[in-house]
Amino acid sequence: MSDIMDRVDNSTRKFKLGDNIHFEISSSANTQGNSHQIPRKQSQSTNSNHQEQSQQARNQSSQSNTNTTSRKKRKKHKKKSKISTVQAHLNNPEDDYPTSRVIKQAPNGDVIVESLEDEDENHHHHEYEEHEDSCEYHPSSKSNTRKNSSVNESTHNKIWDSASIEEQQRLKEFWESLDESKKLDLVKIDKDSIMRMFKNETRHHLQQQLSSSVSSQPQQQQSQQNVSTSSNNGSSSGINNNSNNNNGNNTNSCACKYCGRRNSIIEEELESIYDNHFDDIIDFIHEVRDINDLNALPGLLFGGFHMLEEERRLQKRQQKYKEKWNHSHHSTSVSPQPESQDNKQLKKSQDQNEMKAISIEDEMDKFKSHLAKMSISNSQSNPNQLSEIHLQLKSEDGNLTGTTESQLFNKLLDPKLFEALENMDLDKMKEMSKMDPKNLNNVNILEKATSLREIVRDLNNADRSSLQKGISHVSNMGKFFSNLATLNNAQNLPEIVASGGLDDQLSKGLSSFAEDLLKNDGNSFIGMMEALSESRTAREELLKETVISQNPQEQKSVSIGQSDQSGDVWVDDDDENNRVDVEIHACDNPHHHHHHHQHSNKQHDHHHCHNHRHRHRRRFEELDDEHDQENEDEELEDDEEDYYDEYDDDEEEDEEEDEDDDDIEEEGASDTESEISEEEKMQEIRRLFLIQVIKLFQERLKNAYKEKLSQDRTQKLIEELEAEENAKKERELKKLKQKEKAKEKKRLQQLAKEEERKRKEEELKAKEEEQRLQKEKLKAEQKKRKEEARLKKEEEKKKKIEEQKRKEEEHRKKVEAQQKREAEAKKLKEERRRKAEEERKQKEEEKKQKELLKKQKEEEKRQKELLRKQREEEKEKEAARLEEERTKLMVNDDDELARQIEVEKSKLSAAVANNPLLNHLYQPSPGSAPTTPSTANLPALSPLQSASAKLMSQQFEQQHLQQVSQEKLPQTSNIQSPNQQPHPSISSFQFSSEYNSNASVFHNNSSLLSNPSIMNSPRTTSTNLLNGNSPIVPNVTTNISLGATNTSNLSPWSSKSRLNSLSNSTQPFIGGNQFTQTNTASFNGVGNAVQQSGNFSPFNAFSDPLVSDAFKAAGPAGMNSNIWLNSSNVGNNSGNQSGISAPTTTSTNTSSRNNSIWGNTNPNKVTEPSLLNNNNNNNNGLISVESSGLWNSNGGNNQPARSSSVTGISSNLSTINPISSMDIELIQSTTFNCFQILQNSGQLEFGVAPLMKLFQNVKTILNKPSLTINQFLNCCTINSNVYIFSLKYDDFGNVTHVEVAYKNVPRTSPPPPPGNIVQNQHQVSSPSFAAATASSSSLATSNVPLGFINSGGSPTGLFNDININHGGTSFLPPIGESSTNDAGSSNVGNSGFGRRLWN
């Protein structure tokens, strides 16, 4: 089949339909079409190979065409072509015009004339000469016209497109795995499918021509050999063909008879042929359905048709054997002959051998297919070293013995032979031979057969690669089996056996064969299994000689049957058809394949375009019976003789062509149709249809394989998913099992532990019980011993007791006498000590009374002096008032103001007298304590309670006298030199003498308003806000410098409070003058106390010196300035002595002070500070202004001008809602009480009270709804001798928290820093405690004024008047202090924060 495909694909298939109409179907288009179907990955790597393969295909096609047409055209006369020389040009003008020529048309329309002989010669010298170096070929010895050809890679690609070796192997395995029904469906021949294949191929051929014509000129010249056009006999037909092809290049269809009608004619002709010769084609296809034909295909169709026909062939052989057997049995029964016992045994053994031969014959085809598979797999696995089998047809003069040897040796390796030898009972045959004395010689033969069986066993078990050495043993074995075959075919076999001839022949052959086989250990013959061949010609010659040797004609069929039966023992059905010789060639070219093509019984010429020396051999198809085979042999010989005769005639006609050229032209046209054999035409048609059938089968096989592959992949995916799911379930199950095992293990461990615990408990109990019993036993013994000892001791004790009683009685009497004496002595001593203590206490009490009386006398004296001064001042004020009234400028305003002041004073007195909250507010339990200690860690002192109206009226007279005397006496400065002893003024501790029931003005000695120390302001002298008198020690105050500042209505509640607080006028580090401490003198004011807070406070960020206090304002520039009466005459240097630059005055003369509240107008006006006037004019950097307004008055002509910096209260005290000094002190005391209440109730936040909560409580207690937050903060910022107010700011400069504490209270922890260490301004902590510790030591030695009791660390207050409760008990004891202790004395040592509000 491969041979037919090779011839059909590589040759131009020609059909002649009528006169001068030739068409051909070239395989070049199909080749190119198939080459385009190769995948891109393979086409890139094999591009050059495809060009070589297409060139090979063209050479093969033209050579085959030349061989077939030259033989036919030598017998006919052809006309010379008449081509117009006007339109033609010659490429080679020197060359002669060829007599045997082919006229073609190039894609560009040029006419090409080629010589057939040149083509033939050129094709024999083709580019495939490189294969001569790599392959060896042996010349044929029978016929020059029968050559063996190989299918190269181009044919391989044309048939199977892009199928690689792996794909071919997979398709082959897929074909073998199909069942018979599926295979029948795939190879089923359908007319529509075949005709569709023809039409598609024709269209593809035309498209290929069009694409090749559009390509470039070099490609056109190369492709003109690929696309073969129909040849024409005349010049006119050639010209028409030129024009038609030019038209065909532009369009796919043409109406001319050469192009347009060609496709339809071909299709109609093919369809007609298919309808008329369908059965013939089917028969032909069935004829070529043989294993060797299909094996010649490139691997994929291996075993395809053979497996379909295998069962039919087996049945056919069995039927033939039955017919032969019946015929032989009938012939023997017709002419019976007496047979001896030996002949019967021989016949019986022959029958057994024949039956075994049938089974061997049935299995040979399968074995051959298996060997072919092995050879193909070996060739695929080793592409560089292919062991290729060339089946060579032996010539008539060849060595028949060598062919028979190869055949018989190959049969020796047959597994069926091995099975037959294994099934033979040689021992039993030996016994039977021994029993017959005539067959004693057969015993040796059977022994040799036993050795042969062992050898065959070794051969089948040996390695196949090592059996190539066995070729040298072919001759010996061939001799043995050839003799055996001759004996089996002979008619006188019983006589030969009886005479011992069989013994000699078999023993010689077996002995030589066994010796050669044993020398190689049985490993030298298996290599021949890969080179199994069939030797049909040799066996046919043997059969012919056997038939000729048989003279009786009636025994002809019997002898033929016997020869076939005997031959079937060693030869299968394929050996009847072929006679081959085995040649192994090592080929280095991996793409060079050697295939053995089979010729049909009809002779034909087929020449390949290779320079290889391939041997073509005849292939005789399978016959229905032996008579058909003999007839075929006779026909074959006749065909060969006819072929030789025809070849000789062709040579003679070639010689005559040169002489009678004109005659040939005239006679050739009429003899063309008659010369083409109808049989050859049908043969070509068969081949053409066979190619389409193969392509159809290939397409079906690939589609089935793809479908099967898709199903397998789908199934594999499903299996993988199921496997994955199962694995997942197994993992989960495994996890569950592991968990269960772990639980079980844990449970067992717990059980073991529990059992161990119980066991230990039982052991412990047993031990305890044993110990208890032992203890009880010991106790019983001890008890017994103790009882005995007790009885002895009791007796002894009784004796001792009696003796002891006697001694004790004597001793008691002695002790009683001694005690009496000691009691009397102690009583006398105690009485003496009591008397001495009483005397000491009496002396101390007398001393205290004397000191108190002395102090009282001094205080009375001072009060009288003060009262005198106040009266004088009052007279001056009264005179000034009368003078002011005479001016009639502000009569109505003064009356209204006096009335308002009186009303406010009465309201305030009534509110203080009638407010029970001051006495009974928030009385905590005795065990309550503050939850949050204060930041300063100072002892909590009792708050100042509001005095009743009655108490104020009782003491007003005394206070009035003290005011008068106070104006006359110089006030003691709070700032003293280091050498001076602290001597505070009496008025600095007076709280009960600040109210006057008969006067409408405030006292000028407000102790709470002296010493203004606002936040972190520099140390200044004490200032009386009401009268402005501030005597200053010059030698101390001159050393204190302070840059005067001008603050105008600074308030944290305004929208620009942050800007105001950070303005240049108030920033301590931005202003030109920074306050510094220049001396280390201890001061008696608040400014002297320096406190460095080391405790945690959430408001430490506000102590940054860059952040100015919004409420911090400089004190009054004139320390003696009075907001009500601004005309006070101090010295020229009074302003400078207080550390503040004094304003420039117009006169240096002093004048008397004007004590009038309204002030008297002096002729010489000087600038005075005004509470409501903020415009100041100062030559020292301060602004001094002329006083104007209601409260501005000039004290005298020569009164010095004072620099005025507005205090915190000055911006808020207006005529609409004024705040008096009494209100300021009351607000400060109430604020302290509210702070203590919040502290005791645990409502403080980090030791400080929220501002709004404290403000609301103060406003509620004082019943002052009109009190604003600015007024409250200004009251807190005014310096006080009793309290210290510390304001806490947020990041925006707003006050959020307030801390209140007593002033002048000794610190407990940490100790105060030394007075001579200057604190770093960047590390100043809470401003209100900045000067709290410097004067603590000086305050300890300060004198206590009248009306106060300095009990321990508690400062003097409003309600601890010395005149109340024997002069030693305050009117209301301080917070947390009791008037008496357990012994009845005053509790003078209990002070500090954390005390209860009231006792």
From Swiss-Prot:
Bias type Basic and acidic residues, positions: 341-353, 722-743, 752-888
Region (Disordered): 28-105, 119-155, 202-249, 318-353, 546-574, 589-681, 722-894, 949-990, 1134-1178, 1373-1399
Subcellular localization: Cytoplasm
Sequence ranges of Acidic residues compositional bias: 622-678
Skewed-composition ranges (Low complexity): 53-69, 207-249, 1134-1156
Coiled-coil positions: 708-896
Basic residues bias spans: 70-82, 591-618
Pfam families associated with the record: NST1
Highest rank taxon of the organism: Eukaryota
GO cellular component: cytoplasm
Alphabetically ordered keywords of this record: Coiled coil, Cytoplasm, Stress response
Biased composition (Polar residues): 28-52, 140-154, 331-340, 547-566, 1157-1172, 1377-1390
UniProt KW Ribonucleoprotein keyword: no
Cysteine-cysteine disulfides: none
Similarity remark: Belongs to the NST1 family.
Purpose: May act as a negative regulator of salt tolerance.
Record's protein name: Stress response protein NST1
Source species: Candida albicans (strain SC5314 / ATCC MYA-2876)
Lineage summary: Eukaryota, Fungi, Dikarya, Ascomycota, Saccharomycotina
